[in-house]
């Protein structure tokens, strides 16, 4: 979806050397398929929600490849540039270099922004870069229009009148109560 939102159809992706690999089972990552997919690529952008399960396995699988054939693997963190010692966790504040967030869902717009950023970093023809910029501007305008307004009122939890749980919060004398979830 993110590629289509950026105006990158199958032919354009093929011309740019963009390949997709949808992993069916994330653990363990199938080594032979992974190596076949990675062969000939300069960079791999791993798109996965939450923790870097696939990204770390991919880095480990390709770790011993010669530097001239091993693709740069990115996902949660962006490229730190030449000469940066260590990995992303060697930084004082690794979240300052986030590419795809790990703490929430990844919308097509967020993924599209990451793809566009990486494509522009590795270099694409000027017409495609202009297309990426135009499409991103439209997506950012839509995101701005859909921003959640700041809540001014404080909403306290409560039970609806007539709710059977309302009386269940009162503990009879001599009884003990345990914590539990409620519908409030």
Explain the meaning of each model-derived region.
Residues 6, 10, 48, 65, ...:
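Short secondary-structure junctions and interdomain/linker hinges
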Residues 2-4, 29, 54-56, 167-171:
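Short helix/loop capping segments that flank catalytic or ligand/cofactor-binding pockets
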Residues 14, 19-134:
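Terminal amphipathic helices with adjacent charged low-complexity linkers/tails
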Residues 1, 22, 46-48, 179-182:
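Glycine-rich anion-binding loop/nest that anchors nucleotide
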Residues 2-19, 176-177:
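Short helix-loop-beta junction
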Residues 129-184:
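Cofactor-binding active-site loop characterized by glycine-rich and histidine/acidic residues
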């Amino acid at each position: 979806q993110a590629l289509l939102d950026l105006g990158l159809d199958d032919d354009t992706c093929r011309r740019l050397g963009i390949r997709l690999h949808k992993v069916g089972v994330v653990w363990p990552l199938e080594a032979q398929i992974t190596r076949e997919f990675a062969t000939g690529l300069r960079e791999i952008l791993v798109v996965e929600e939450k923790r870097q399960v696939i990204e770390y396995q991919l880095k480990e699988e390709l770790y011993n490849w010669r530097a001239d054939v091993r693709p740069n693997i990115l996902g949660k963190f962006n490229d730190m540039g030449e000469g940066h010692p260590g990995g992303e966790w060697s930084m004082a504040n690794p979240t300052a270099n986030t590419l795809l967030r790990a703490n929430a869902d990844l919308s097509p717009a967020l993924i599209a922004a990451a793809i566009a950023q990486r494509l522009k970093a590795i270099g694409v023809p000027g017409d495609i870069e202009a297309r990426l910029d135009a499409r991103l501007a439209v997506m950012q305008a839509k995101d701005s229009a859909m921003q959640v307004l700041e809540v001014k009122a404080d909403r306290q939890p409560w039970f609806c009148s007539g709710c059977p749980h309302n009386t269940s919060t009162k503990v009879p004398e001599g009884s003990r109560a345990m914590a539990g979830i409620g519908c409030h």
